[in-house]
């Protein structure tokens, strides 16, 4: 299928303190085989030189707009960008991402399906440069299977603007706003399809500390959004069983404690198995990788409980989210 110049798309990107990554993203936008009709970058109050850098990169190029929105979370920034978009079809991606040169082309091509879809999700993969990033992918990135996308991501999608209008846009949250938006889209009976070939690449957190901070924040906002059933309760049930094993080990027989390493290894093996189409079974036989998978898993568990506790203690945040 050749590029359809008559198919006009508005590409919306929220940005905040992205001076280290924004140049690469804009470069991959310029290399798209299917060019968007307009690119709207909504800055959410960057305190570094992101805005000035964008102005230098873009210059007087046609089609680019920078909106300085003041302090704006990702959801609010997307709302502002979408509200200001001039065209029927809206594409979303995020800063810190590298787009495959045919990403938008494949999304656009999918609109030619019959019946015409209202919402198209593309694919994504993490950028893997070292063992930590590979193990992190195994732990918390959804697996990539042949012929399908990893999971639905708001940072790789194309849809009709009317869908955004019908669901009322995004809640103005720091995290989980994308999940709420996507759920509202599905609840409306929107015709949603996927396109595995539309690939973008995103950066993982580079170490345990930043990984903990990320999941601590996500955990807190997911609790405020009332989404514990999708994440927290499952983890809590596992640890309740582990506490039972510990008590039995203390009160009955130390043999019960042997179930602790078995539980940890089983979780690691399950994750390795789910990613076998990407990495094969090699991480299972690499003791360093296997141990690192367990450590990252426990780090995320700790962040889950930490964020959960913070959400329960910070009632103002709960009330703010519940009123959105």
Model-derived features: where do they sit?
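Short, acidic, metal-binding catalytic loop of nucleotide-sugar glycosyltransferases
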Residues: 27-36
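A conserved acidic beta->alpha catalytic loop
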Residues: 43-52, 94-97
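Glycine-rich, basic loop-to-helix element that forms the pyrophosphate-binding segment
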Residues: 68-85
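Short aromatic/hydrophobic "clamp" motif used to bind/position activated sugar donors
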Residues: 90
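Conserved donor NDP-sugar-binding/catalytic core segment of glycosyltransferases
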Residues: 102-133, 203
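A recurrent flexible, glycine/aromatic-enriched loop bordering the glycosyltransferase active site
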Residues: 126-127, 141-159, 174, 200-203, ...
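Catalytic donor/gating beta->alpha subdomain of glycosyltransferases that bind UDP-sugars
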Residues: 171-230
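Membrane-embedded multi-pass helical conduit in multi-pass membrane proteins
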Residues: 240-315
């Amino acid at each position: 299928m050749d590029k359809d110049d008559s198919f006009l798309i508005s590409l919306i990107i929220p940005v905040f303190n992205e001076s280290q990554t924004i140049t690469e993203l804009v470069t991959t936008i310029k290399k798209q085989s299917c060019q968007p009709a307009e690119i709207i970058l909504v800055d959410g109050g960057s305190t570094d030189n992101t805005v000035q850098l964008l102005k230098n990169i873009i210059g007087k190029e046609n089609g680019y707009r920078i909106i300085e929105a003041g302090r704006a979370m990702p959801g609010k920034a997307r709302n502002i960008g979408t509200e200001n978009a001039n065209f029927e079809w809206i594409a979303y991606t995020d800063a810190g991402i590298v787009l495959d040169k045919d990403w938008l082309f494949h999304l656009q091509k999918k609109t030619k399906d019959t019946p015409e879809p209202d919402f198209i999700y593309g694919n994504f993969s993490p950028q893997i440069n070292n063992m930590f990033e590979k193990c992190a992918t195994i732990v918390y990135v959804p697996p990539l299977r042949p012929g399908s996308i990893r999971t639905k991501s708001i940072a790789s999608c194309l849809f009709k603007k009317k869908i955004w209008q019908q669901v009322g846009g995004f809640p103005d949250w720091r995290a989980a706003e994308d999940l709420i938006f996507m759920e509202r889209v599905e609840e409306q009976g929107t015709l949603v399809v996927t396109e595995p070939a539309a690939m973008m690449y995103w950066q993982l957190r580079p170490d345990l500390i930043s990984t903990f901070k990320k999941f601590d924040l996500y955990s807190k906002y997911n609790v405020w959004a009332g989404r514990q059933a999708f994440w927290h309760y499952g983890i809590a049930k596992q640890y309740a069983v582990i506490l039972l094993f510990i008590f039995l080990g203390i009160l009955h027989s130390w043999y019960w404690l042997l179930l602790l390493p078995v539980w940890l290894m089983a979780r690691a093996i399950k994750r390795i198995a789910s990613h076998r189409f990407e990495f094969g079974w090699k991480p299972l036989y690499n003791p360093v990788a296997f141990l690192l998978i367990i450590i990252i898993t426990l780090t995320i568990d700790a962040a889950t409980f930490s964020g959960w506790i913070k959400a329960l203690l910070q009632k103002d945040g709960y009330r703010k989210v519940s009123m959105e």
